[in-house]
UniProtKB/Swiss-Prot annotation:
GO terms for biological process: acetylcholine receptor signaling pathway; regulation of neurotransmitter receptor activity. It is a lipid-anchor; GPI-anchor. GO terms for cellular component: dendrite; endoplasmic reticulum; plasma membrane; side of membrane; synapse. Acts in different tissues through interaction to nicotinic acetylcholine receptors (nAChRs). The proposed role as modulator of nAChR activity seems to be dependent on the nAChR subtype and stoichiometry, and to involve an effect on nAChR trafficking and its cell surface expression, and on single channel properties of the nAChR inserted in the plasma membrane. Modulates functional properties of nicotinic acetylcholine receptors (nAChRs) to prevent excessive excitation, and hence neurodegeneration. The keyword Glycoprotein applies. It is found in: Cell membrane; Cell projection, Dendrite; Endoplasmic reticulum. Residues 23-107 form the UPAR/Ly6 domain. A lipid is attached at residue 95 (GPI-anchor amidated serine). Induction: Up-regulated by prenatal nicotine exposure. Residues 96-118 form a propeptide. This is Ly-6/neurotoxin-like protein 1.
Length: 118
């Protein structure tokens, strides 16, 4: 192999295959109902995350952030407060909150309330 070809291959292997572009997410810490605060996330972040915590059927708080890994969760019915987490991977995808119907989102709260009455 010629020295020029070797140098070309070494330089080519050092180049990234595609430019790395940072993800844009809405970011807020426990806002009242929802928030719209766009922010450029660090390069190693792969997900926008939204967490909603329901204290009562009419009182909830929303938290949105940039996270390197994310696990979607739905309220399990065993803790005092209902909490759900949603993850997505494109710019400003967490603007609308959780992509589940409101009746489904409130179902765990209603079940927890009924469980507490028993």
């Amino acid at each position: 192999m010629t020295p020029l070809l070797t140098l070309f291959l070494v330089v080519l292997m050092g180049l990234p295959l595609a430019p790395v572009q940072a993800l844009d997410c809405h970011v807020c810490a426990y806002n009242g109902d929802n928030c719209f605060n766009p922010m450029r996330c660090p390069a190693m972040v792969a997900y926008c995350m939204t967490t909603r915590t329901y204290y009562t059927p009419t009182r909830m708080k929303v938290s949105k952030s940039c996270v390197p890994s994310c696990f979607e969760t739905v309220y399990d019915g065993y803790s005092k407060h209902a909490s759900t987490t949603s993850c997505c991977q494109y710019d400003l995808c967490n603007s609308a909150g959780l992509a589940i119907p409101a009746t489904l989102a409130l179902a765990p709260v209603l079940l927890a309330t009924l469980w507490g009455l028993l």
